[in-house]
Amino acid sequence: MDFDEVLEKYDPVMGLEVHVELGTETKMFSASSAHFGAEPNSNVDPVSLGLPGALPVVNAKGVEWAIKIGLALNCSIAESSRFARKNYFYPDQPKNYQISQYDEPIAYDGYLDVVLEDGTEWRVEIERAHMEEDTGKLTHLGGTSGRIHGATASLVDCNRAGVPLIEVVTKPIEGAGARAPEIAKAYVSALRDLVKALGVSDGRLDQGSMRVDANLSLRPIGQEEFGTRTETKNINSLKSVEQAITFEMQRQAQVLDDGGVIDQETRHYQEADGSTSKGRPKETAEDYRYFNDPDLPPVIAPREWVEEIRATLPELPWVRRARIQEEWKLSDAEMRDLINANALDLIIETVEAGTTPDEARAWWVSYISQKANESGVELDALGVAPAHVARVVALVSEGKLTNKLARQAIDGVIAGEGDVDAVVAARGLEVVRDDGAIEKAVDDALAANPDIVEKYRAGNTKVTGAIVGAVMKATRGKADPAQVNQLIAKKLA
């Protein structure tokens, strides 16, 4: 069903659950390393493997960072919260239960204000932020798109099992209408910026450091009661969040219009076409048979400790943006463009690395954003760091690279050929400084274009572009355009 048709009949109600992997050195309940990227099943221990008799010990840093996230989300912090066992059987959960929090979360009743593409603010209310441990990772072999359906075998990697997670759960988002997909994207983006600013997570959606579950239901316009919801699991990019919700709105509306019913189920997002596919029936809280974990005491967070943590909060993203907008004298529209391109933090870091704001903006918003779009990845997942941009800007300023050569250097960085200096050396990109070679190229170009020489001497000085182009082609773009123009003017004087 067409998106506009959906909105004529139905009101979407949305809820977002975002799992944020904390960047602690060790796991939530054991001393095993929590680092990403190790060999499969190398960061494991008796606790994360669920071996008999192994007892959990709470990671104090994980609790501190959970409180920090709660405070930044304007939540109330519970003086006493508890861990609970969430019971279910799945190969990536060695204990057959997950240590989580149920009816006594560490943070609750907060909000996060997000800015939409046209500058409108929307307040997303937070129901809770609770601590839990991550599961292991399954790799399915022989199935479709890596899914379990049709798989001939499944491999289990328990490195991730026990890594600290904070799950941030929104209250139902009502009244969003056509803007529901945009609000979801803006919220996830704002939450990612927040945890990165706090220094508690790298917020990498592409690596699973943040994973989004999107709950959606439709109800006829004017109806108060919620419809049956579906939960699209483990969405791993901002674009995918927007597409998944858009597709689910259209799919559910079509089912309802055809006289069908919506099944309460999980669904899988398909990156290839932006659709969702059927998963499994969705459990209720009762199905998990939660009960307080008898191996873990309550988590006590005295007011004094909470206030000490509050005092350590860094400049938060929205405060930073207001300061930057004033310092750089940006209009509201210019600021929105940077935010909508997910480029602002990268630009700020590039300026901190030594460029001017205009130089940093020119690179991130144009050429590098274009490359990210062509690759279908988020800007910060392209492989270009602020230090790379600062380096090419410096080399252009020093006359060692032209803008064209600088773009080739960035291409090499994206291709994984090394840092900027390594790419310049390997590709031989540095500007030609052989005056004799450049002068010969200019002489050859002038000799090959007598009509342009004649027009120039007749007073049309704008025709030299073709000569400059011929020289740049002859030198494979390595001549300094300013030097070429000076030589042309000198020879035609």
UniProtKB/Swiss-Prot annotation:
Record text on subunit structure and interactions: Heterotrimer of A, B and C subunits.
Purpose: Allows the formation of correctly charged Asn-tRNA(Asn) or Gln-tRNA(Gln) through the transamidation of misacylated Asp-tRNA(Asn) or Glu-tRNA(Gln) in organisms which lack either or both of asparaginyl-tRNA or glutaminyl-tRNA synthetases. The reaction takes place in the presence of glutamine and ATP through an activated phospho-Asp-tRNA(Asn) or phospho-Glu-tRNA(Gln).
Organism the protein comes from: Corynebacterium glutamicum (strain ATCC 13032 / DSM 20300 / JCM 1318 / BCRC 11384 / CCUG 27702 / LMG 3730 / NBRC 12168 / NCIMB 10025 / NRRL B-2784 / 534)
Biological process according to GO: glutaminyl-tRNAGln biosynthesis via transamidation; translation
Phosphoprotein among keywords: no
Parts forming coiled coils: none
Catalytic reaction annotation: L-glutamyl-tRNA(Gln) + L-glutamine + ATP + H2O = L-glutaminyl-tRNA(Gln) + L-glutamate + ADP + phosphate + H(+); L-aspartyl-tRNA(Asn) + L-glutamine + ATP + H2O = L-asparaginyl-tRNA(Asn) + L-glutamate + ADP + phosphate + 2 H(+)
Keywords recorded for this protein, A-Z: ATP-binding, Ligase, Nucleotide-binding, Protein biosynthesis
EC number in record: 6.3.5.-
Gene3D superfamilies referenced in this protein's UniProt entry, alphabetically: 1.10.10.410
PANTHER family on file: GLUTAMYL-TRNA GLN AMIDOTRANSFERASE SUBUNIT B MITOCHONDRIAL AND PROKARYOTIC PET112-RELATED, GLUTAMYL-TRNA(GLN) AMIDOTRANSFERASE SUBUNIT B, MITOCHONDRIAL
Single GO MF descriptor: ATP binding
Region (Disordered): 268-291
Compositional bias (Basic and acidic residues): 280-291
Protein name per Swiss-Prot or TrEMBL: Aspartyl/glutamyl-tRNA(Asn/Gln) amidotransferase subunit B
Similarity field: Belongs to the GatB/GatE family. GatB subfamily.
InterPro entries referenced in this protein's UniProt entry, alphabetically: Asn/Gln-tRNA_amidoTrfase_suB/E, Asn/Gln-tRNA_Trfase_suB/E_cat, Asn/Gln_amidotransferase, Asn/Gln_tRNA_amidoTrase-B-like, GatB, GatB_Yqey_C_2, Gln-tRNA_amidoTrfase_suB_CS, Gln_synth/guanido_kin_cat_dom
Pfam families for the chain: GatB_N, GatB_Yqey
UniProt key word Nucleotide-binding: yes
